Amino acid sequence: TKHKIISEIAEKTGLLVQTGGGIRNMETLERVLASGVKRAILGTGAVKDKSFTCRAIEKYNDAIVIGIDAREGMVAVDGWTKSSNNYAVDFAVEMEKIGARTIIYTDISRDGMLKGTELSVLEEMVAKTGMDIIASGGVADFTHVLEAKKSGAAGIIIGKAIYEGKVDLKKCLQNV
């Protein structure tokens, strides 16, 4: 199962693992956290069930990260298949009010495209909240990492660019 694989990764590597996807109730959240992950990412669950999100943050504090996946600034849900009526920055502010401390902001129109991170929404989110905002989506080279850092991002998620050898992770970790 997914949870068994995640548990093995956390146990065998000693890495601090975070995971998301399908966490929409306390039972699933507790199973995920029991598998050895450091942080659980609430995405659609946070958008669709504020009561669940409040309970999760109240009980697990910093182990909860809010994943805001957005297309053209609007929050997407259900595996990116539907857009909501929530503007990403407004939703981040709302999540901060209920106690969230960390956001992973993904511009899904750029995820895996290697075209750089869309900075305007990221910068606005950083400016309007006191949370740690982690940027995700579009990183193609070290310049994009520096741009995200300059915009105020607390961190950045790099995927495809590492797999394809376009970004040297060691260089990023040493220089940012």
Task: Report the location of each language-model feature.
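Glycine- and other small-residue-rich loops at beta-strand/loop junctions that grip anionic moieties
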Residues: 21-22, 42-45, 106, 111-114, ...
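Structural motif corresponding to alpha-helix initiation and N-cap regions
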Residues: 3, 26, 47-50, 85-89, ...
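Conserved anion-binding
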Residues: 30-33, 37-111
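Short active-site-adjacent structural elements
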Residues: 112-114, 142-145, 164-167
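Alpha-helix-loop-beta-strand connector modules within alpha/beta enzyme cores
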Residues: 1-18, 54-69, 114-141, 176
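C-terminal helical cap(s) of enzyme catalytic domains, especially alpha/beta-barrels
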Residues: 52-59, 64, 149-176
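Catalytic cores of alpha/beta
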Residues: 13, 17-39, 120-155, 172
